[in-house]
Amino acid sequence: DEIQFNETTLWTGRSTDLSGGGSGYGKYENFGSVFAENLNDAFDFSSEGGAVNYYRQLDLSNATGKVYFEDKNGVKYTREYIASNPARVVAARYTASEPGKLSLRFSMKGGSIKGIKPSYAEDGGTFSGKLETVSYNARFKVVPTGEKATVKATAEGIEVMNADEVLLILAGGTDFDAYQQSFVSNTAQLAGAIEARVNDAA
C-alpha cells in the first residue's frame, strides 16, 4: 500500500525579479510517500497465497476511497482513505473481519527531493529538510487498537502486530509565507506545528 502525498508550497527556487526572466523561479516538488507493508503470514504472494476478491471503491459523495480483499483463510480486510481539508491531514483506516489479524510495517520516503532520511520513534515517522528557500516537514502517526496489539519502531519503520484496527494520520507542510519579503516565517515552529496537526487528528 502506498499513500503518495503533496503540498502546494513545496517548491525549489527563490524570490526573483520577473523582469530578469524568472530564472530563480524553481519548480514544484513531490513531497513523498507512506508505505504499509503486510507482515501477516496469511499472504505469501504465490498464486495460492495471494489476496483474492480484491476491489476498489471511490465515493465522490463523501470523498473517500476504499480497498477490499480477502486472504487465503477467508479473513476480509478493508482500507479506507480520506484527505481532510479542515484538519489538513490524510487519514487511512485499516480493519480486518477477525481480531488480531492486522500486522503491518509503516515506513516513509521522500519523493523528488534527494537525500531525505526518515526517522522512526514510538508510534510514527518523520522527515524534514530545507530547499533553497522553504523548509519542509512531514510526519505520520499510527494508532492501533486491540488487546494483543503491539507497536515497535525499527530502522525500517513502525511495526504494528496483531491489531484489530489501525489508524494512520499523515501531514506535511512548509514554512512558506507569501506575505513576507523572504517568503518564509515561523521556521522554528514548523516541526511542532506538523506534529500538533497529526496528534489533534488522531
Where are the regions that the model predicts?
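Aromatic-residue-lined binding/catalytic grooves and analogous aromatic/hydrophobic interfacial grooves
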Residues: 1-202
